[in-house]
C-alpha cells in the first residue's frame, strides 16, 4: 500500500515538535514571538472550544496526569490568578490527562474552574506538540517515574524539592497565618506556625513542602480517580500564550517533574508583560 504524502498540517506540526525538542534542551521558557508559529494541532483543538478562537489573548496549559504534582500545583496558582487574567482579557484553558471523574475531583480540590478544563484519556495533543514524554526506559512507567523523582531525566527536580523545605525569600507566602492546613498524616497545622518558625511575607521553610504533602495525600487517597491509567505517568506538559491573531507570545516546555514554570518562585511571572 503506498504511503500517503505528508500534508502541510503534518509538516507544520513536525516542525514545531522538532523546535520544541530543541528548545527543551535550552531555555525552558521564553517569549516566542518570531521564534515559532503556533502549531496547527493546538489551533485546531482551540477552534472546537467556545471562547478560545482568535480575537483575544489565550493562555493554554497542557497538564500532565491530573494526579501529577505539577498539575495540582499549577492549577492552584492559576485558580488564584483568575481575577487578574480576566481583567487582562486573557482567556484560560487547561487540557490534562484523565477522565471526567478525575476532572471533577481535580477541580473541586484545586479550585480550578470546571468549564476551563478539558481531559484526554491519552496524551495525543501532548505528543503532537512534541512535549517531553519523560523517561521511557525498560521497566514501565513506575520505575521511570521514580527515577525522575530522583532527578534522573528530570533536571531541576531535586533543587525544587529542596526549595520546598528550605523556603525562598523571593517567593510569596503560601499559607495565611489564620489558615489551617491538613497535610496527610500530620495533625492540622495553623499558618501561624510558619510565621513563628520563619517570619511572614515570603515562602517560609517547610511551607511549600507542606502544601505539596497535602496535594500528595489527596491524590494517593483517590489514586484511581486521579490517574485512571498508569501508562502516562512520566508525560510532561507545556504552556502556550497566544495573541489575538493566533501568533505565539510565549511558550514553556516542561523538562521534568516540578518544572511547569521557568520561574518556580513565581510560576505565573511570565504573564507580567501582558497583565497590565
PLM regions: where:
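Short active-site neighborhood of thiol/selenol oxidoreductases, capturing the structured segment around
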Residues: 50-80
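Thiol/selenol-based redox catalytic cores and closely related redox-interacting motifs
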Residues: 120-256
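N-terminal targeting signals for export/organelle localization
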Residues: 1-43, 272-276
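Conserved helix-turn-beta segment immediately C-terminal to the redox Cys motif
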Residues: 73-94
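Thiol-based oxidoreductase modules, predominantly thioredoxin-like and allied folds used
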Residues: 89-102, 115-121
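A short, polar/charged loop-to-alpha-helix boundary motif
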Residues: 257-273
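A short beta-strand-turn-helix
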Residues: 34-58
Amino acid at each position: 500500500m503506498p504511503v500517503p504524502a505528508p500534508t502541510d498540517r503534518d509538516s507544520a506540526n513536525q516542525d514545531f515538535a522538532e523546535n520544541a525538542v530543541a528548545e527543551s534542551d535550552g531555555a525552558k521558557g521564553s517569549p516566542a514571538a518570531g521564534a515559532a508559529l503556533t502549531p496547527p494541532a493546538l489551533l485546531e483543538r482551540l477552534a472546537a472550544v467556545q471562547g478560545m478562537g482568535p480575537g483575544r489573548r489565550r493562555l493554554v496549559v497542557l497538564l500532565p496526569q491530573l494526579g501529577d504534582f505539577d498539575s495540582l500545583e499549577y492549577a492552584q496558582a492559576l485558580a488564584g490568578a483568575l481575577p487578574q487574567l480576566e481583567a487582562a482579557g486573557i482567556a484560560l484553558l487547561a487540557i490534562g490527562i484523565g477522565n471526567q471523574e478525575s476532572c471533577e475531583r481535580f477541580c473541586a480540590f484545586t479550585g480550578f474552574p470546571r468549564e476551563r478544563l478539558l481531559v484526554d484519556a491519552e496524551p495525543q495533543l501532548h505528543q503532537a506538540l512534541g512535549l517531553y514524554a519523560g523517561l521511557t526506559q525498560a521497566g514501565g512507567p513506575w520505575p521511570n517515574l521514580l527515577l525522575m523523582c530522583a532527578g534522573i531525566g528530570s533536571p531541576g527536580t531535586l533543587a525544587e524539592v529542596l526549595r520546598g523545605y528550605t523556603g525562598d525569600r523571593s517567593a510569596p507566602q503560601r499559607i495565611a497565618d489564620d489558615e489551617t492546613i491538613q497535610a496527610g498524616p500530620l495533625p492540622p497545622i495553623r499558618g501561624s506556625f510558619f510565621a513563628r518558625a520563619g517570619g511572614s511575607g515570603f515562602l517560609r521553610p517547610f511551607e511549600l513542602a507542606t502544601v505539596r504533602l497535602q496535594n500528595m495525600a489527596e491524590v494517593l487517597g483517590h489514586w484511581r480517580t486521579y490517574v485512571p491509567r498508569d501508562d502516562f505517568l512520566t508525560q510532561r506538559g507545556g504552556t502556550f500564550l497566544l495573541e489575538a491573531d493566533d501568533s505565539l507570545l510565549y511558550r514553556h516546555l516542561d523538562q521534568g517533574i516540578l518544572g511547569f514554570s521557568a520561574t518556580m518562585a513565581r510560576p505565573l511571572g511570565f504573564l507580567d508583560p501582558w497583565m497590565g
